Amino acid sequence: MDSNRLYGQCHCGAVQFSIPATLDLTAARRCDCSLCKRRGAVMLSCPRDDVRIESGEDMLVRYKWNTKIATHHFCSKCGIMTHHHRRTTPTICGINLGCIDSLDYRNYQTVPMNPGSDFTLVDENETQT
């Protein structure tokens, strides 16, 4: 293991990934868009090129909705969302902090909110896929 990286995984361990240990963990945010508010995850921004899927890439399923630009990645076995590629900034991933092994998630009880519900919708009645 590289001490310059933080390691994480889904609940069942089928999907494992790493991110740079130098990321500012105090920059974690919640989002209040229709998907994020339902999953309740605390997310951390990370340059997309710095996210490494260490194992289980074949176990990831992808979910896109509305504009079909943002891609949300879930383990096909346990259903945990590990990360997503953003619609507003495609070069940035949102990493689910709850998946990072070495972090005490209790330290993130009070986290600033990003106003995802303010994002423009193409069609509020669009069929979800």
Predicted regions and their residues:
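A short Gly-Trp-Pro
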Residues: M1-Q9, A14-T129
